[in-house]
UniProtKB/Swiss-Prot annotation:
Protein name, as recorded: Cytochrome b
Cofactor: heme b
Similarity remark: Belongs to the cytochrome b family.
Entry keyword Electron transport: yes
Stretches that traverse the bilayer: 33-53, 77-98, 113-133, 178-198, 226-246, 288-308, 320-340, 347-367
Main location: mitochondrion
A GO CC term attached to the entry: respiratory chain complex III
Miscellaneous section: Heme 1 (or BL or b562) is low-potential and absorbs at about 562 nm, and heme 2 (or BH or b566) is high-potential and absorbs at about 566 nm.
Gene this chain is encoded by: MT-CYB
Positions of a ubiquinone binding: H201
Co-factor note (free text): Binds 2 heme b groups non-covalently.
SUPFAM superfamilies, per the entry: a domain/subunit of cytochrome bc1 complex (Ubiquinol-cytochrome c reductase), Transmembrane di-heme cytochromes
Keywords noted in UniProt: Electron transport, Heme, Iron, Membrane, Metal-binding, Mitochondrion, Mitochondrion inner membrane, Respiratory chain, Transmembrane, Transmembrane helix, Transport, Ubiquinone
Protein purpose: Component of the ubiquinol-cytochrome c reductase complex (complex III or cytochrome b-c1 complex) that is part of the mitochondrial respiratory chain. The b-c1 complex mediates electron transfer from ubiquinol to cytochrome c. Contributes to the generation of a proton gradient across the mitochondrial membrane that is then used for ATP synthesis.
Length: 379
């Protein structure tokens, strides 16, 4: 008799995706982040659902409703801090996942890669709108500054900003619609994840060597299920430690001050995971130019497969490209640091140099070095 998991209409889909899926035998821990992102999304949707039961999206009561969640709701503080720090974990895993894709040449699966970029934008939009909901000082001013950037779009900019605000400033209408979209977007993200996996399973996984692994495949279960569970335990332990010992470590103290349109905070800055893009935005002294650079800092990932000039897929055996990759990582850390600093000397010039380097490495240096490596290997 055939096993039910192979015949049942629903179970056979799960079986072919998580049980009998042929996977390369050489996948390292860098391949764990996809499943970790799935866990992050599940944690965010669950905690978010329970938070939404107690939150009110009205400018008069939003801040107090968050205080009420933390003080009066059973384990409300746990839910709130799991949700806030869960977002940080989400982005740590996201950036490591994208970094893995860049290093090992996974971007040559262009459909999977492009859906991934779409997912990155969707998660960033969700996180931005979520940050506005507690209606603290940084929520209000962050929303004002970032939405105001759209006014740089020629001709329609001002109308577009007022349309998004639902008035002439960030107010009640803005908060209500941001809450609606913040609730909706994670489900769109979940749907996109399904498409992401669908395209991935069309081609099969890449592996650290970048060499086709068809002759050497192993079943996903039990090998990678156990490996993924270990990853879950490590990540959830780290998240729990963050939530229970220093829940406000990654937040901004200004957000514990209720939103006040008449009082601007000394340094308006987004959450840490947007600082690199914020630094790139600030490094260009022109509004439209800055907005374009901000969008391109993420959209540049779509160009990476086109600029792949190496005869090898992975960077595993390409030391010169490896050097550039780690230089890129250092540049991103530098940009993250600069994004949190005031706009003054020497931070401005460091940010500008780092921004130029960021685009130069991805657009010029990596393709050139790849060609050079081909020549060195007489290919």
């Amino acid at each position: 008799m055939t096993n039910i998991r192979k015949t049942h209409p629903l179970l056979k889909i799960i079986n072919s995706s998580f049980v009998d899926l042929p996977a390369p035998s050489s996948l390292s821990s860098w391949w764990n982040f996809g499943s970790l992102l799935g866990v992050c999304l599940a944690v965010q949707i669950l905690t978010g659902l329970f938070l939404a039961m107690h939150y009110t999206s009205d400018t008069a009561t939003a801040f107090n409703s968050v205080t009420h969640i933390c003080r009066d709701v059973n384990y409300g503080w746990t839910l709130r801090y799991l949700h806030a720090n869960g977002a940080s974990m989400f982005f740590i895993c996201l950036y490591l996942h994208v970094g893995r894709g860049l290093y090992y040449g996974s971007y040559t699966y262009s459909e999977t890669w492009n859906i991934g970029i779409l997912l990155l934008f969707a998660v960033m939009a969700t996180a931005f709108m979520g940050y506005v909901l507690p209606w603290g000082q940084m929520s209000f001013w962050g929303a004002t500054v970032i939405t105001n950037l759209l006014s740089a779009i020629p001709y329609i900019g001002t109308d577009l900003v007022q349309w998004i605000w639902g008035g002439f400033s960030v107010d009640k209408a803005t908060l209500t619609r941001f809450f609606a979209f913040h609730f909706l977007l994670p489900f769109i993200v979940a749907a996109l994840v399904m498409v992401h996996l669908l395209f991935l399973h069309e081609t099969g996984s890449n592996n650290p060597t970048g060499i086709p692994s068809d002759p050497d495949m192993i079943p996903f279960h039990p090998y990678y299920t156990i490996k993924d569970i270990l990853g879950f335990l490590i990540m959830l332990t780290a998240l729990s430690a963050l939530v229970l010992f220093s829940p406000d470590l990654l937040g901004d103290p200004d957000n514990y001050i209720p939103a006040n349109p008449l009082n601007t905070p000394p340094h308006i800055k987004p959450e840490w995971y947007f600082l690199f893009a914020y630094a790139i935005l600030r490094s260009i002294p022109n509004k439209l130019g800055g907005v374009l650079a901000l969008v391109l800092s993420i959209l540049i990932l779509a160009v990476v497969p086109i600029l792949h000039t190496s005869k090898q897929r992975s960077m595993m055996f390409r030391p010169l490209s490896q050097f550039l990759f780690w230089l890129l990582v250092a540049v991103l850390f530098t940009l993250t640091w600069i994004g949190g600093q005031p706009v003054e000397y020497p931070y401005v010039i460091i940010g500008q140099v780092a921004s130029i380097l960021y685009f130069m490495i991805l657009l010029i240096l990596m393709p050139l070095v790849s060609i050079m490596e081909n020549r060195l290997l007489k290919w």
